[in-house]
Amino acid sequence: MAIYMSTICFGSIECKLPYSPASCGHVTEEREVLASVEPFMDLEAQLSARLLRQKHATVRVLKNGTCAYRYKTDAQIVRIQKKLERKERDEYHFQMAAPSIVSKITIAGGDPPSKYEPQTPKRVIHTTPRVRKVKKHSIIKLTESQMNHLIKQVKRIMSAKKGSVHLINKKSTHVQYKEILGTTRAAVRTAHMMGLRRRVDFRCDMWTTERLKCLARTDKWSNRVHTINIRKGDSGVILNADSLKGHFGRSSGGLFIVRGSHEGKLYDARSKVTQGVLNSMVQFSNAENFWKGLDDNWARMRYPSDHTCIDGLPVEDCGRVAALMTHSILPCYEITCPTCAQQYANLPASDLFKLLHKHARDGLSRLGSDKDRFVHVNKFLVALEHLTEPVDLNLELFNEIFKSIGEKQQAPFKNLNVLNNFFLKGKENTAHEWQVAQLSLLELARFQKNRTDNIKKGDISFFRNKLSAKANWNLYLSCDNQLDKNANFLWGQREYHAKRFFSNFFEEVDPAKGYSAYEIRKHPNGTRKLSIGNLVVPLDLAEFRQKMKGDYRKQPGVSKRCTSSKDGNYVYPCCCTTLDDGSAIESTFYPPTKKHLVIGNSGDQKYVDLPKGDSEMLYIAKQGYCYINVFLAMLINVSEEDAKDFTKKVRDMCVPKLGTWPTMMDLATTCAQMRIFYPDVHDAELPRILVDHDTQTCHVVDSFGSQTTGYHILKASSVSQLILFANDELESEIKHYRVGGVPNACPELGSTISPFREGGVIMSESAALKLLLKGIFRPKVMRQLLLDEPHLLILSILSPGILMAMYNNGIFELAVRLWINEKQSIAMIASLLSALALRVSAAETLVAQRIIIDAA
């Protein structure tokens, strides 16, 4: 046996091993090699039909939210495939076609049809034109679908408001929506509901039946209703015959109109019953329950009588008088309506008295000739009319008395206030309040009897009101971050918004006219000369000293009109200043300045650089507009964030109210209003105010000083002191003096092109109202209006219709959302207007109810 060597490698090591081949012979055998098979080929062939159906299927959503395939039929799939093949074939032929230019399009290569039409020449027909134009009224015709849509919309509206619908064909059918069986359902008026007992309780034709079926399809129409759940008061209700369960009779048209029951079986009102069934049938009307409750409680609740009662009055007339009394005392549209009862209970006492008075008077007129038979009813209604007769209360007198002595609680003013309140309440006073009023009247009688003399007033010769030599310390002018490197006040954003004052209430000084054209300031009772001419400084010292003397104007001495008092005590900030000897301090020459605002009344005056206008020219207040310097001085104490709103309020709210040459009291009142919105202005320093008793005028000194001298000087130096004039109880002549006002010719204050542009001028009331109406129906305009001019919301109180439209469109809610985090005062205004709209809506409901009751 031969031995061979075999080599085996382990990495880089070779091993040689001997071996001997087998002694058996070689056998040759062919092995069958299986061909490679695609494992998913059979699966794809099996699923090809399913995948083809899913390819053309659409997806639909079931009621439970599950998505499922909606498969096409075999015929639809064949049509879809043929359409796709035809589209691919046409696209292939189009792509492979030779390029060509289309220059003409014809019908089958022929001429257009218009070429073969005979052309008849047009000739003029000479006729007399008709003067009267005939109006052709088109007949409105509705298709079946439009008619069904109209009925559905009417049904939706009436079911929501519990209204009624009348179907008119050959006869009228009244359909009323009521709350029955836990939902709103339609009900018809049957014969037994009107007191008639007939074998057929309700008749209607096929057209009415179809319309009733449409009107009765309200919410829960398909819900199951069992006959045992139907009770008294459900007569005439229209039910779904397919969803009705229990023992009931025949019906038609898919409707079941409830009539009554007999031996446990419910009957349709359209069914014809026998006379025996009619006599023993239990009708489902509320009338039987009403009479049952009346009969059961009449004998139990009646009072004992001292005579033997007889039947002397007709029963029908007694029923009519009972209805008359019910509507006179407890008016309602339906006696079973809880809403009518709640509205009656919610009436204020004054409104209830007015309602009873009117209904008692109507009851007397309705009683008519029967008052001789029903004398007790007539006497009761006469007494009720007299007791509830409204008293004509004059609120103006009450307000006048309250403003005069309302805050005084010492005698005899306390007793007068008690009587004032007593007369205001009128017939609503209780027995205790009558007793208190009589005691107050007794105290007043004793006081008047024992009074012998008035309290002696103090002598004006002892009046002193010295002007402090110390200057007021202004925080805003002393803060480092409000000053520049030269210690001048920085206006910041206030300078930009102050342009609303300069563009509307100031005018540029024209150098061509000269300073002399602006020296005379006119007011209603005279003139005052400014020292603007002294801006041209003479170099001659004697001439300069002569100009500094001014023009002296003699004023009367210190008298009662120089003072202001309250409760017998002087209010010194509202009085003229005096020297130590009691004589008045007279104003001296005030030199002019160039582009400065002069503030401060005590000590040294403060000079603040004026905000820059649109040009580098000098600015002077328009004639009669000097008081605008008060608001310009208040702007110093307003933060930069509120400067825009402040200037707009002054422009749009204060100036229109002040009018031409307002009184000092009106100016103080507007300052008090602005202090509520911007509390920081309470200590704002004012320009010096000069008092001219001869012309009864207060002059606000501006940057151009005053050439006229001799005026008295008002002590008020801050806004909080000026506000003291806004008091009706302040005894002062100065508060009625004129200060300044709107010029006669200022056309740019009438309207504005763009109410949203920065620095836009004031709008008139009509223009602002038109803009507000425009914003109601344009949300973008209203949103911008709320951001720029939110106080225009207050104009909505001019009309209840505007107020309700803004409330229904959610404008007040939008205003609250926009301003609740920015300025709560505006959000509060929007909330108050929203609450007012709710009260207007309730008032309209009460008026509508009263009209319905009067018409009943």
Swiss-Prot record:
Residues 141-284 form the Peptidase S30 domain. One of its GO terms (biological process) is symbiont-mediated suppression of host innate immune response. A motif (Involved in virions binding and aphid transmission) lies at residues 592-594. It is an enzyme of class 3 (hydrolase). The record marks F284, S285, G740, G741 as: Cleavage. Keywords: Host-virus interaction, Hydrolase, Inhibition of host innate immune response by virus, Protease, Serine protease, Suppressor of RNA silencing, Thiol protease, Viral immunoevasion. GO terms for molecular function: cysteine-type endopeptidase activity; serine-type peptidase activity. It holds the Pfam family Peptidase_C6. It comes from the Viruses. Belongs to the potyviridae genome polyprotein family. This is Genome polyprotein.
